[in-house]
Regions:
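Class I S-adenosyl-L-methionine-dependent methyltransferase catalytic core
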Residues: 1-184
Length: 184
C-alpha cells in the first residue's frame, strides 16, 4: 500500500500483518482526499480507529498541520509509530494507545479538530456510538468522515452536524458530515 498524494506520494505504508486492521484501500483514500481537496492544508486531522495510520499519514502528506491517531491495538499502534518514524513526522503527530469510545470525550474536551475520520471495524456498531460522543461536544464546523458498509445502519440524523455527501465504492461507503452549531 502506498501514499496517493502530497509530499510523500508513492511512499510505502506499512500495515499490520495479522489482519487485525482493515486499511482503507489506496483508491478510496485518494477519493476521500479528492473530496477534501485543498481544505486540508494547515488544518488538524483526527484519525479514530487508526489501524496502520494510513489515512492520517495521507492527510499530513497532503498538507495537514498535524494528525492525532487513536488506536487501542498494540500491534497497530506500533505500526503507526514505525510509519511515522520512517517519514520523520513526529513533530506533527500524537499517537494515543486508547479505546476510542472511552478516550474520545476526554480528547475532544481538550482539543478541537478540523477533520475527524471514523473507521471502526465493520459490524461492530461503533460508528453510531462514536457519532453520539462527537454530538455531545462543540465540533466547530469540523468535517467528519465515516467509513461504513452498506449493510450497516448508521444514524446520520444529528442535532449539531449534517450529512453533506456520500460516496459509495463497492462494499464501502464514505459519508461526509459537517458541524453546524455549538451543542452544549
Amino acid at each position: 500500500m502506498r501514499i496517493t498524494g502530497g509530499t510523500l506520494k508513492g511512499r510505502r505504508i506499512k500495515t499490520c500483518r495479522d489482519n487485525s486492521t482493515r486499511p482503507l484501500l489506496s483508491r478510496l483514500r485518494k477519493s476521500l482526499f479528492d473530496v477534501i481537496g485543498e481544505r486540508i492544508k494547515g488544518l488538524s486531522f483526527l484519525d479514530l480507529y487508526a489501524g496502520s495510520g494510513a489515512v492520517g499519514i495521507e492527510a499530513l502528506s497532503r498538507g495537514a498541520r498535524r494528525a492525532v491517531f487513536v488506536e487501542k491495538g498494540p500491534l497497530a499502534a506500533r505500526v503507526i509509530e514505525e510509519n511515522i518514524a520512517s517519514y520523520e513526522l513526529f513533530s506533527q503527530v500524537k499517537i494515543w494507545r486508547k479505546n476510542v469510545l472511552a478516550f474520545l470525550p476526554i480528547l475532544l474536551e481538550g482539543e478541537k479538530f478540523d477533520f475527524i475520520f471514523i473507521a471502526p471495524p465493520y459490524y461492530k456498531k461503533m460508528q453510531n456510538k462514536t457519532l453520539d460522543i462527537i454530538e455531545e461536544v462543540e465540533i466547530n464546523k469540523a468535517t467528519i468522515i465515516v467509513q461504513y458498509s452498506p449493510h450497516e445502519n448508521i444514524n446520520f440524523t444529528r442535532r449539531n452536524m449534517g450529512i453533506v455527501k456520500q460516496k459509495e465504492y463497492g462494499d464501502t461507503i464514505l459519508a461526509f458530515l459537517e458541524g453546524t452549531v455549538h451543542c452544549s
